[in-house]
Curated annotation (Swiss-Prot):
GTP binds at D48, I49, D67, K69, E126. Signal peptide: none annotated. It comes from Methanothrix thermoacetophila (strain DSM 6194 / JCM 14653 / NBRC 101360 / PT). The keyword Kinase applies. It holds the Pfam family DUF359. Belongs to the GTP-dependent DPCK family. GO terms for molecular function: GTP binding; kinase activity. It comes from the Archaea. InterPro entries: GTP-dep_dephospho-CoA_kin. This is GTP-dependent dephospho-CoA kinase. Its EC number is 2.7.1.237.
């Protein structure tokens, strides 16, 4: 099984937002980006807190990618429970920190090819999951993820954004997992 590993030289680059940074928190961020979310082909949420506030604001993402952590610490039970309230397909995958496993990549691709809202629960870390979400999402989709201690990032999926993500993924180190 193939694993993409984040090289040291990409770490600083990926700390920069991939889309528009909304300097706000919680439902306020969702409200500020709501026109884009309503117009989006699909809505993808990456991260437990991002997913929580989208659900709280009554936006049901087509795909939610969570790891039950925020800033490397477990999320509160109330946040986990909010995720469980919906009726959607649940997929469990492994994805160690600083990587994108083939298992996660396949789960994102398959989820975005389907019609059923899906929650991917990552054992490990989902920090890089916005990359395949952008790559595999239909054009016109919105990918939302948190920028720790700053706000939320909204990425509208365009052909140019997909090419940018392909370039980033090509620069990651490929390893074979036994």
């Amino acid at each position: 099984m193939r694993v993409l590993v984040l090289p040291e030289e990409l770490r600083d680059e990926l700390k920069e937002p991939l889309g528009v940074l909304y300097r706000c928190h919680g439902v306020e961020c969702v409200e500020r980006m709501s026109d884009h979310l309503r117009a989006a082909e699909r809505v993808i949420a990456v991260g437990d807190i991002t997913t929580f506030y989208l659900l709280k604001a009554s936006f049901i993402p087509d795909l939610m990618i969570v790891d039950h952590k925020t800033k490397r610490s477990p999320v509160e039970d109330s946040i986990k429970r909010r995720h469980l309230e919906g009726s959607y397909r649940v997929v469990n995958v492994e994805n160690p920190a600083g990587t994108l496993t083939e298992e996660l990549l396949d789960a994102v691709r398959e989820s975005l090819n389907g019609c059923t809202p899906t929650e991917i629960i990552v054992d490990g870390e989902e920090d890089l999951a916005a990359l395949p979400a952008i790559l595999y999402a239909p054009l016109g989709s919105a990918v939302v993820y948190g920028q720790p201690s700053v706000g939320s990032v909204l990425v509208m999926v365009t052909p140019e954004k997909k090419r940018e993500i392909e370039g980033i993924l090509r620069r990651m180190t490929v390893k074979e997992k036994v």
